[in-house]
Amino acid sequence: MAQTLYDKLWNTHVVHTEEDGTTLLYIDRQLLHEVTSPQAFEGLKIAQRPVWRISANLAVSDHNVPTTDRSHGIADPVSKLQVDTLDANCDAFGITQFKMNDVRQGIVHIIGPEQGATLPGMTIVCGDSHTSTHGAFGALAHGIGTSEVEHVLATQTLLQKKSKNMLVKVEGTLPRGCTAKDIVLAIIGKIGTAGGTGYAIEFGGSTIRALTMEGRMTVCNMAIEAGARAGMVAVDDTTIDYLKGRPFVPTGAEWNQAVEYWRQFKSDDGAQFDRVVELNAAEIVPQVTWGTSPEMVTSIDGRVPDPEREKDPVKRDAMERALAYMALEPNTPIESIKVDKIFIGSCTNARIEDIRAAAYVVKKLNRRVASNVRLAMVVPGSGLVKAQAEREGLDKVFTDAGFEWREPGCSMCLAMNADRLDPGERCASTSNRNFEGRQGAGGRTHLVSPAMAAAAAIEGHFVDIRQLG
């Protein structure tokens, strides 16, 4: 019987299934960070349990670490406690960790693939919503809660119920100026933030196949914003080429065996999906969110929608509340919206490809950050991304134009460190969530691609990067 990619990943990890469908799954890799792991480790200590499979875990501090000068450590006592606690727990249990001043440190969903700890055919979990990122490698990856983090540490298994299968098929050539971020925002705009609820989404079609691994990770990263449990892309040569030679990847004869095994992780011809959604890539334009949910998105050449035209009273109320919070009027052209701050970073868009795309726009415009922009910051996703960008001179492109070039971390995506918006400030952000207060109490977030964020920094408002040439 023909199987989907999700079916194969699920079936190869079943330990036991109850009559009601509840399944005990084996977990190949757990990624840990400082926010959702302390209680899990404490639970192990209280129960006097060891970590079942130490080598299956990899840890890094990312949420609370400062992105400015780290020579004096972490100033905030709560943030310092969380980071110090992860350090102590990893030392106590023997878990591999990239500490704050390790060049390999970075955002957990960037360092996993970067190190080759994310591999095709794996089940991967982390106490973090955007674990779906790793599905770009033909893996089953999703976020879990703190009690589940403890369960995986203790047993290397997890109780789950199987999701339904959804295929999101994007065909055609992506227009100039459009990126993976625009693809996934367009998908969420089409199906809504509840469109994927109860499903695992496979992203397929010629447009997805043409993406780099960085682009595929961006798309899978935001599967959770479409309501899905997981997002994934089939394994192909692009996947294999990206992984070869990375530190955690098999070598020699084991590499050849692994590649042969990995190539099975794609949907069979004739595999049945519970739902299929199709998009024409040629119709996608640069996207900008206008509200307080990723589904509240429109094209750069569009306008802020008018709630009065919405027939659904629930949606209309949500739109009215969002516009009030965002301080926007219906029918406002998106290009006329001015911004106060720029954030280029996050597990969605802080890889080297993203940094290059933003730097290209800055260099093309050949001007400094607009006078109305109070802060424009670039936060690489890892120390290795930062080092690569600096070797290419990209840091100087940004700093010469008035951007701040920072140390790696989650940063302004969720404002758990000192990087945040003040009340009323408007930000063009390459992150994944534009909820109320996400980037700081009263802050107003517009989600865009790195190129769009860079252009907004220079112009002081949103612009159509397709016009840049």
UniProtKB/Swiss-Prot annotation:
Catalyzes the isomerization between 2-isopropylmalate and 3-isopropylmalate, via the formation of 2-isopropylmaleate. The keyword Lyase applies. InterPro entries: 3-IsopropMal_deHydase_lsu, Acnase/IPM_dHydase_lsu_aba_1/3, Acoase/IPM_deHydtase_lsu_aba, Aconitase_4Fe-4S_BS, Aconitase_4Fe-4S_dom, IPM_dehydratase_rel_enz, IPMI_cat. Pathway: Amino-acid biosynthesis; L-leucine biosynthesis; L-leucine from 3-methyl-2-oxobutanoate: step 2/4. Its EC number is 4.2.1.33. NCBIfam families: leuC, PRK05478.1, PRK12466.1. Keywords: 4Fe-4S, Amino-acid biosynthesis, Branched-chain amino acid biosynthesis, Iron, Iron-sulfur, Leucine biosynthesis, Lyase, Metal-binding. CDD domains: IPMI. The keyword Cytoplasm does not apply. Binds 1 [4Fe-4S] cluster per subunit. It catalyses: (2R,3S)-3-isopropylmalate = (2S)-2-isopropylmalate. Its cofactor is [4Fe-4S] cluster. It comes from the Bacteria. This is 3-isopropylmalate dehydratase large subunit. One of its GO terms (molecular function) is 3-isopropylmalate dehydratase activity. One of its GO terms (biological process) is L-leucine biosynthetic process. Heterodimer of LeuC and LeuD. Belongs to the aconitase/IPM isomerase family. LeuC type 1 subfamily.
